[in-house]
Amino acid sequence: MPGQPTRDQVAALVDHTLLKPEATAADVVALVAEAADLGVYAVCVSPSMVPAAVSAGGVRVATVAGFPSGKHASAIKAHEAALAVACGAVEVDMVIDVGAALAGHLDAVRSDIEAVRCATSGAVLKVIVESAALLGLADESTLIGVCRVAEDAGADFVKTSTGFHPAGGASTRAVEVMASAVGGRLGVKASGGIRTATDAVAMLSAGATRLGLSGTRAVLEGLGQN
């Protein structure tokens, strides 16, 4: 996104996120109300919380699959995603098996993504690649390879991070590499550690087309009023 984006422009790209294990249904209802007030794109909640978010109404609902480790069997990820879509989720953020990617088993990564893609027809599929781990434990070529596999498997977005991996969250370097790899054919979601307006603008300038934020209000307030 060129130039300085407005508050509303950024809000329209935000998945307002609550994935803490201790989150309650009441917390999710409050999240949805806040999301509607802030004018964000969607909320992102745990699969078991999708019904509460959908019932609260007024905002798109995204969820996760294989979260946060990505070590679930592909059939489990696919079933989890399918159940969430049946409950009203319109977007699914799945986690790859990072170990498989680091070992160079890209066919396994592709099959994993394809399983979830087949189970979520009509929903937007984002593939979480844990970019900090791939860059820290391997190199840019590994990250590029995973992004291209995600594209081949039918993903709509590649996403930097769960926000739970010890290697860290989003970085402008990772977003730039990912955006270059998919060349505008897929969206790029930056998520994990984006806490300020400066962080958000930097990610958008690097090529992100969606942001995953838990502290959304603070980020938007940092952008001022339109």
Curated annotation (Swiss-Prot):
Pfam families according to UniProt: DeoC
Subcellular localization, as worded in the UniProt entry: Cytoplasm
Pathway: Carbohydrate degradation; 2-deoxy-D-ribose 1-phosphate degradation; D-glyceraldehyde 3-phosphate and acetaldehyde from 2-deoxy-alpha-D-ribose 1-phosphate: step 2/2
Molecular function terms, GO-annotated: deoxyribose-phosphate aldolase activity
Presence of the UniProt keyword Cytoplasm in the record: yes
Similarity comment: family membership: Belongs to the DeoC/FbaB aldolase family. DeoC type 1 subfamily.
Name listed for the protein in its UniProt record: Deoxyribose-phosphate aldolase
